[in-house]
A protein has these predicted regions:
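Single conserved hydrophobic/aromatic residue that forms the stacking wall/gate
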Residues: 151-163
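Short glycine-rich anion-binding loops that position phosphate/pyrophosphate groups of nucleotides
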Residues: 45-46, 80, 149-150
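Positively charged, low-complexity intrinsically disordered leader regions
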Residues: 2-71
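Helix C-cap/helix->beta junction micro-motif
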Residues: 35, 92-94, 140
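Conserved beta-strand segments of alpha/beta enzyme cores
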Residues: 38-40, 95, 118, 143-144
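General beta-strand structural signal in soluble alpha/beta enzymes
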Residues: 23, 27, 41-43, 75, ...
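Active-site-proximal loop->helix
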Residues: 73-136
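Generic transmembrane alpha-helix signature in multi-pass membrane proteins
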Residues: 61, 84-86, 163
Length: 163
């Protein structure tokens, strides 16, 4: 596994600037008083997709080989990660498939489709959708983009610390 370093964070931060908006830090009087520290909030809901998840997805795609990009990618999500992957894939011209539980709110399904992803509704809960997405990835030779467990996802997500 790759090592997380300040340099890797900085490289990820630079790369995701291509697909994200800068967001300001907002001082929180409430949380500062509750913790005895100066606490600032970073409104990542102001990103194009409404969440920080686009950072990890975009960076992950940037690290994929051209061959892997040609084959496409797949993920499972019921919301923000789905939209982040769809948005990032569209920016790179990569075919994205998103497996979402059948219980996913229609607005999330439609926004994901709106970014160009193929959406497959499968299973009642995330775990079922994820299992199916991993099965399809293996069968079709697609890159599976996990919402949490990859260094490529965590580096740009933690980029918030740098900014």
């Amino acid at each position: 596994m790759e090592e997380l370093t300040l340099k890797s964070f900085e490289e990820a931060a630079e790369k995701v600037k291509e697909a994200t908006l800068p967001t300001n830090l907002v001082y929180s009087e409430y949380f500062s008083s509750q913790t005895g520290n100066r606490v600032y909030l970073k409104p990542e809901n102001m990103q194009y997709t409404g969440a920080y998840k686009v950072r990890g997805a975009y960076y992950k795609i940037s690290t994929m080989s051209e061959e892997a990009r040609q084959k496409g990618l797949i993920t499972a999500s019921a919301g923000n990660h789905a939209q982040g992957v769809a948005f990032a894939a569209k920016k790179y011209g990569v075919k994205a498939t998103v497996v979402m539980p059948t219980t996913t709110p229609l607005i999330k399904v439609n926004r994901t489709k709106g970014y160009g992803a193929e959406v497959i509704l499968y299973g009642n809960v995330y775990d079922e959708a994820c299992e199916y997405a991993m099965k399809l990835a293996k069968e079709k030779g697609l890159t599976f983009v996990h919402p949490l467990s990859l260094i490529h996802i965590s580096e740009p997500t933690r980029r918030v610390v740098i900014s």
